[in-house]
């Protein structure tokens, strides 16, 4: 990718935001992702990395390469979300098999990009624009993405709790300097439910920050 920097720059010119997704540990993701990120970041583009770490059965050598690639990528992105493939077993409703394991990992990467893109592109009652997202994600370092869903009584509160304690990521909401909250629901959701969910998340990250400082 080093020899293709000019081509990469030409392809990225005019972009406001770039997502770099990769499975770390292999040659392409580990080697190329940091180069693409460097070019994008140097162009002043908001650069977000969403990457996966190998399954444990892929071996220590691949995990070592992944850790090195993640460290290199972190130097050139504004925000970096790292998803350990091993944790997919903790959230999957189905049995993770050798055949579908890598497809599940790809789906998580796709969902990460779609979730962040939807904040800007999908109309909502309270709309966020690109400036809002940029103010949170610019030069943020490691980022945490939590997703929760629930039904029935207390659904908003239960979904918020699930998002805060999502087992998918190694990071936590502790120490966060900013939070973007996206609530998707049926049209009849009550204002109280929204306030409960947002309040729970806000209190959680500010409380944890206070304990860390």
Predicted regions and their residues:
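Tubulin/FtsZ superfamily GTPase core signature
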Residues: 1-212
């Amino acid at each position: 990718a080093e020899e293709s920097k000019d081509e990469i720059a030409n392809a990225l010119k005019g972009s406001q935001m770039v997502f770099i997704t990769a499975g770390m540990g292999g040659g392409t993701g580990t080697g190329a992702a940091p180069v693409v990120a460097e070019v994008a970041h140097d162009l002043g583009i908001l650069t977000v990395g969403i990457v996966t770490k190998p399954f444990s059965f892929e071996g220590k050598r691949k995990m070592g390469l992944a850790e090195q690639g993640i460290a290199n990528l972190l130097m050139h992105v504004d925000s970096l979300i790292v998803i350990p493939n091993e944790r997919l077993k903790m959230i999957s409703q189905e049995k993770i098999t050798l055949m579908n394991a890598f497809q599940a990992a790809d789906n998580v990467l796709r969902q990460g990009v779609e979730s962040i893109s939807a904040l800007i592109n999908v109309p909502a009652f309270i709309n966020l624009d690109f400036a809002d997202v940029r103010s949170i994600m610019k030069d943020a370092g490691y980022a945490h993405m939590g997703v929760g869903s629930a039904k029935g009584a207390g659904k908003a509160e239960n979904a918020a709790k699930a998002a805060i304690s999502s087992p998918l990521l190694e990071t936590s909401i502790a120490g966060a300097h900013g939070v973007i909250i996206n609530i998707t629901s049926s049209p009849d959701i009550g204002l109280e439910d929204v306030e409960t969910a947002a309040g729970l998340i806000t209190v959680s990250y500010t409380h944890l920050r206070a304990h860390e400082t």
